[in-house]
């Protein structure tokens, strides 16, 4: 399982102590955004697997917004954000094409 990290020594300088306080806040904010990102991506992928085109499109728009936010804040590199959006978009688009082809075959 995961082992606890060894405790770091406290900084001596005031600027170092302030930096530690800031890091704790930033870490919490970044972790929250990453979690939001993972949840959004999973929701889009679930909708695609379920074959729900409208829901997938709606969730993709929300996921796209979250990915852009994370990229703007510098949590993810802009290229990673673009790559993730592209892959999700391809899945949603493939679902839409599949939905269009299915009625004509039946």
Curated annotation (Swiss-Prot):
Entry protein name: Small ribosomal subunit protein bS20
GO biological process, one term: translation
InterPro entries in UniProt: Ribosomal_bS20 (IPR002583), Ribosomal_bS20_sf (IPR036510)
Function comment: Binds directly to 16S ribosomal RNA.
GO CC term, one of those recorded: small ribosomal subunit
Entry's family note: Belongs to the bacterial ribosomal protein bS20 family.
Segments for region (Disordered): 1-21
Encoding gene, per UniProt annotation: rpsT
Segments passing through the bilayer: none
A GO MF term: small ribosomal subunit rRNA binding
Record keywords: Ribonucleoprotein, Ribosomal protein, RNA-binding, rRNA-binding
One Pfam entry name: Ribosomal_S20p
Compositionally biased tracts (Basic residues): 1-20
């Amino acid at each position: 399982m995961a082992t606890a990290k060894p405790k770091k020594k406290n900084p001596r300088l005031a600027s170092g102590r302030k930096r530690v306080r800031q890091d704790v806040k930033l870490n919490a904010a970044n972790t929250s955004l990453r979690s939001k990102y993972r949840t959004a991506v999973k929701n889009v992928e679930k909708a695609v697997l379920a074959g729900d085109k409208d829901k997938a499109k709606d969730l993709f728009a929300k996921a796209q917004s979250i990915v852009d936010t994370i990229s703007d804040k510098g949590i993810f590199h802009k290229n990673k954000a673009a790559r993730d959006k592209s892959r999700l978009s391809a899945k949603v688009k493939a679902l839409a094409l599949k939905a269009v082809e299915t009625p004509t075959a039946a």
